[in-house]
From Swiss-Prot:
Record function comment: Component of the ubiquinol-cytochrome c reductase complex (complex III or cytochrome b-c1 complex) that is part of the mitochondrial respiratory chain. The b-c1 complex mediates electron transfer from ubiquinol to cytochrome c. Contributes to the generation of a proton gradient across the mitochondrial membrane that is then used for ATP synthesis.
Pfam families linked to this entry: Cytochrom_B_C, Cytochrome_B
Other facts noted in the record for this chain: Heme 1 (or BL or b562) is low-potential and absorbs at about 562 nm, and heme 2 (or BH or b566) is high-potential and absorbs at about 566 nm.
Stretches that traverse the bilayer: 33-53, 77-98, 113-133, 178-198, 226-246, 288-308, 320-340, 347-367
Cofactor note: Binds 2 heme b groups non-covalently.
Family from the record: Belongs to the cytochrome b family.
Disulfide bonds, paired cysteine numbers: none
Location of this chain's protein in the cell: Mitochondrion inner membrane
Protein name: Cytochrome b
Membrane-topology descriptor: Multi-pass membrane protein
Keywords in alphabetical order: Electron transport, Heme, Iron, Membrane, Metal-binding, Mitochondrion, Mitochondrion inner membrane, Respiratory chain, Transmembrane, Transmembrane helix, Transport, Ubiquinone
């Protein structure tokens, strides 16, 4: 009798991706975040679908519809807060996943890495548009400030902004199209994730040592399925704890005030996961310069494979590179903190120094440390 798992057209793909997939025997818990991101994505799509059933994308009723979801819909409050905090968990896993990739040299799988950055950008766009939908003060002013950045583009900037707005200001047309894009983009993310996995399975997974592990592979199931399930349970536990005990911990109180174009909040800021990029944007006094720095803060990741100078792949045996990596991590935490602070001294100068250091570490310090370590390995 034929084994359906190995011979059926559809089951064969699933089998080769999640069951019989040859996996390095020594990958640590840092490799769990890929599956956790998958779980976050599924959770977001399901909760988002139920929210979309009750939400209305109209400036007059959007805020009221979110209130209605929380008050009148059965477990609407739970679905809404799972969706909001699920986004935070999504980005936490994303940042840890990218950090793992940098530390262990996974970026040398160029196609997988580039696909991952495209996924990051798409996810950031989706999250930004989702933040606009409740139509609170921070939603409205966040949308106004961020979309207005496009006006820094020479010649076509103003026309481009009005084209995105669908009006002469952030209004009903903007909210409707943001809702449409926020609904469709997660399905694009699912498709891009499949391409990401396709490229990954072409090369096989990296491992902590960065050494080729062709001779030491084990099947993905049951070893890593069990390990992933443990990670998933832990993630869901953290998410449920956050949602049930402190649902507004990571949100902004200003978003509980309905959007008012005549009243600007004292301090406009995005969600915590965008604060590092927002701090880099604000650190440059010139508008176009700030926008370019903001773009480069993400696009610089595309250059990681080109900036790799070390003869070793992973940082596990490279103490100098480890120091620069943790310096980068600390710098990103400082930028995140600065992004949440008002634009006044000493925050301005700290933000400028942290922004310079961010680019300096990636473009200069990391490649130089790789070269120094290469010379140190010569006996």
């Amino acid at each position: 009798m034929l084994n359906i798992r190995k011979n059926h057209s559809l089951m064969k793909i699933i089998n080769n991706s999640f069951i019989d997939l040859p996996t390095p025997s020594n990958i640590s818990s840092w490799w769990n975040f890929g599956s956790l991101l998958g779980l976050c994505l599924i959770t977001q799509i399901i909760t988002g679908l139920f929210l979309a059933m009750h939400y209305t994308s109209d400036t007059l009723t959007a805020f009221s519809s979110v209130t209605h979801i929380c008050r009148d819909v059965n477990y609407g409050w739970l679905i809404r807060y799972l969706h909001a905090n699920g986004a935070s968990m999504f980005f936490m896993c994303l940042f840890l996943h990218i950090g793992r990739g940098i530390y262990y040299g996974s970026y040398l799988f160029k196609e997988t890495w580039n696909m991952g950055i495209i996924l990051l950008i798409t996810t950031m766009a989706t999250a930004f548009m989702g933040y606009v939908l409740p139509w609170g003060q921070m939603s409205f002013w966040g949308a106004t400030v961020i979309t207005n950045l496009l006006s820094a583009i020479p010649y076509i900037g103003t026309d481009l902004v009005q084209w995105i707005w669908g009006s002469f200001s952030v209004d009903k047309a903007t909210l409707t199209r943001f809702f449409a894009f926020h609904f469709i983009l997660p399905f694009m993310i699912v498709a891009l994730t499949m391409v990401h996995l396709l490229f990954l399975h072409e090369t096989g997974s990296n491992n902590p040592t960065g050494i080729i592990s062709e001779s030491d592979k084990i099947p993905f199931h049951p070893y890593y399925t069990m390990k992933d399930i443990l990670g998933m349970i832990s993630l869901l536990l953290i998410l449920m704890t956050l949602t049930l005990f402190s649902p507004d911990l990571l949100g902004d109180p200003d978003n509980y005030t309905p959007a008012n174009p005549l009243n600007t909040p004292p301090h406009i800021k995005p969600e915590w996961y965008f604060l590092f990029a927002y701090a880099i944007l604000r650190s440059i006094p010139n508008k176009l310069g700030g926008v370019l720095a903001l773009l480069m803060s993400i696009l610089i990741l595309f250059f990681m494979p080109l900036l790799h100078t070390s003869k070793q792949r992973s940082m596990i045996f490279r103490p100098l590179s480890q120091c620069t990596f943790w310096l980068l991590t600390s710098d990103l935490l400082i930028l995140t903190w600065i992004g949440s602070q008002p634009v006044e001294d000493p925050y301005i100068i700290i933000g400028q120094l942290a922004s310079i250091l961010y680019f300096l570490i990636i473009l200069f310090l990391m490649p130089v440390m790789g070269l120094i370590e290469n010379s140190m390995f010569k006996w």
